[in-house]
């Protein structure tokens, strides 16, 4: 394979999902595989970091082999290797970083540390219909809730963020209160479909304050108190919680668009798969003339495809790690990233 074809391998191991993606400079995404260790963690009611790390060790090499074989490429065809360096669980990040650095060193190709949330932010660029820069991005996941003004790849300004629980974390904790198990977000969404919108009305924290920051911990507390009083109204509580969170996110997105003057909104991260949220945002977009872009459902949650894409942009721009030492950044501000030339 001619080296004019730039091929990037992406490795995602920031939490409980092991993902591998392969991105080609001419063909785009040519392969990806994902393994989730949700079943391992479900009996504990949440992610156990040590178990997640051990599972990454078992899964990542077979996934790489499968992706390369299915795409009819070999390790020797790779031009660079990108890996999630943060934010995330330290042990889990170390697995991906160590493997990526070792492979890159042995193959004589560059490696690149990728910011997990930049991967999510750029995931809609894997679709046929792609957003154009500049835009506002709403990143909603189990660990983060952020509004970002995106002028170009690597040129990011945080407009607002959660001051306590991320919205995905609030979904999971509320689901646990309702006895729905882990992961709770999808289960709560399913239960909410059976709920009555008019039974309960949850508060909308911080929507009447200036600024674009979020707070979701109060909703979780409100859900617990409501459930204590009305234990037979699980579906109605789930519905009220979902309505409140989608309203908060919609209101803040609209304010961010008005503040920046942007006409494009990108919504990504695990919670972006929520259909009620998409419906609410799409309705807002039609009303104010804003174009909204999402990743396909399989790329809303953590995956290797988005890491391969984000890594490809930077590696093909000449950016790479300066050495093969294993470095991770469990806490990493997205504003620290450099702009692509």
From Swiss-Prot:
Alphabetical GO biological process terms: tRNA threonylcarbamoyladenosine modification
Entry keyword annotation includes Manganese: no
Entry's family note: Belongs to the KAE1 / TsaD family.
Matches recorded under PANTHER family: TRNA N6-ADENOSINE THREONYLCARBAMOYLTRANSFERASE, TRNA N6-ADENOSINE THREONYLCARBAMOYLTRANSFERASE, MITOCHONDRIAL
Cofactor: Fe(2+)
GO terms of molecular function: iron ion binding; N(6)-L-threonylcarbamoyladenine synthase activity
Species: Vesicomyosocius okutanii subsp. Calyptogena okutanii (strain HA)
Top-rank taxon: Bacteria
Pfam family, one: TsaD
E.C. no: 2.3.1.234
Function, in words: Required for the formation of a threonylcarbamoyl group on adenosine at position 37 (t(6)A37) in tRNAs that read codons beginning with adenine. Is involved in the transfer of the threonylcarbamoyl moiety of threonylcarbamoyl-AMP (TC-AMP) to the N6 group of A37, together with TsaE and TsaB. TsaD likely plays a direct catalytic role in this reaction.
Keywords on record: Acyltransferase, Cytoplasm, Iron, Metal-binding, Transferase, tRNA processing
Recorded catalytic activity of this chain's protein: L-threonylcarbamoyladenylate + adenosine(37) in tRNA = N(6)-L-threonylcarbamoyladenosine(37) in tRNA + AMP + H(+)
Binding positions for Fe cation per the UniProt entry: 116, 120, 302
GO CC terms in record: cytoplasm
Cofactor mode of binding and number, as noted: Binds 1 Fe(2+) ion per subunit.
Gene name as annotated: tsaD
Enzymatic class: transferase
Principal place of residence: cytoplasm
Subcellular compartments: Cytoplasm
Binding site for substrate: 139-143, 172, 185, 274
Protein name, per record: tRNA N6-adenosine threonylcarbamoyltransferase
């Amino acid at each position: 394979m001619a080296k004019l074809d730039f091929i990037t391998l992406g490795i995602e191991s920031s939490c409980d999902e092991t993902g591998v993606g392969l991105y080609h400079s001419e063909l785009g995404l040519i392969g990806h595989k994902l393994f989730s260790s949700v079943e391992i963690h479900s009996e504990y009611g949440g992610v156990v970091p040590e178990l997640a790390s051990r599972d990454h060790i078992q899964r990542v090499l077979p996934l790489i082999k499968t992706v390369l074989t299915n795409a009819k490429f070999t390790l020797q065809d790779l031009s660079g290797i990108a890996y999630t360096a943060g934010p995330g669980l330290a042990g889990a990040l170390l697995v991906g970083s160590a493997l990526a650095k070792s492979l890159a060193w042995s193959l004589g190709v560059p490696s690149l540390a990728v910011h997990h949330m930049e991967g999510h932010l750029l995931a809609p660029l894997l679709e046929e219909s792609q957003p154009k820069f500049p835009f506002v991005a709403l990143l909603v996941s189990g660990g983060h809730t952020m509004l970002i003004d995106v002028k170009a790849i690597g040129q990011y300004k945080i407009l607002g963020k959660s001051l306590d629980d991320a919205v995905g974390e609030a979904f999971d904790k509320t689901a646990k209160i309702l006895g729905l198990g882990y992961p709770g977000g999808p289960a709560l969404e399913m239960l909410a479909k059976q709920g009555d919108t008019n039974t309960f009305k949850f508060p909308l924290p911080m929507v009447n304050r200036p600024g674009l920051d979020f707070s979701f911990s109060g909703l979780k507390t409100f859900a617990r108190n409501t459930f204590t009083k009305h234990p037979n109204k699980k579906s109605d509580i789930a519905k009220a919680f979902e309505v409140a969170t989608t309203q908060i996110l919609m209101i803040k997105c609209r304010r961010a668009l008005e503040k920046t003057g942007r006409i494009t909104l990108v919504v990504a991260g695990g919670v972006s798969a929520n259909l009620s949220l998409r419906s609410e945002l799409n309705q807002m977009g039609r009303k104010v003339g804003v174009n909204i872009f999402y990743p396909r459902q399989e790329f809303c949650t953590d995956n290797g495809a988005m890491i391969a894409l984000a890594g490809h942009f930077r590696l093909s721009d000449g950016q790479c790690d300066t050495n093969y030492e294993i470095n991770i950044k469990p806490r990493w501000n997205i504003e620290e990233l450099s702009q692509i030339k």
